Amino acid sequence: AGASAGCGNPVGIADAKTGETVLDLGSGGGIDCFLAAKEVGPTGSVIGIDMTPRMLELASTNAEKLETTNVVFKLGHIEQIPQEDDSVDLVISNCVIALSEQKERVFSEIFRILKPGGRFVISDIVTDKPLPDDVRKSAAEWVSCVGGAAVMSDYLAMVEETGFDKIEILEDRKSTGGTEEWRSSMINLTLRAFKPAE
């Protein structure tokens, strides 16, 4: 499908059910959306959100090629998701929240759009200690999902403070690549949490 960079496989472990509504934050070329679309079937639906028109165009082209009819792509930002309150069963995201400077806002938006009892499965880059200032301020490191990586304990605290419960780390493996000392603190995190049922 092209133009999809990730740090995990949220769809593979999200356990999307037939008939569910799934929303993908930062859908890129749409690969995670198309995988989710197969799981939810024709009675379900998948919404891909991306902030770049070029990616939306690519994803729509890919949807046509794959003859996928239960996926829609929307232009939007993850800090202000263009979706109704309490309307989604499952939110997925693959290495996107690290790109936001407003992670608390992103988690609040996820909480807002999830139905009571709904869940998210997110793969993201975090660290086990604060990054050096020069890394956090480097545009190149932000683009590669590194510069915006939060310390894992802070990331988990944001999720909990938003109101999610049953927070579960599904995977946390050290990132590989690079020779700089700080790279050894990078972690690929996959996390699941639930919006409490009413």
Show the residue positions of the predicted features.
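Short, glycine-/aromatic-enriched active-site segment of Class I SAM-dependent methyltransferases
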Residues: 127-146
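A short glycine-rich, Lys/Arg-flanked "PGG" loop and its adjoining helix->strand segment in the class I
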Residues: 104-119
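Class I SAM-dependent transferase core
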Residues: 1-23, 62, 135, 182
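Core SAM-dependent methyltransferase catalytic element
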Residues: 165, 172, 176-198
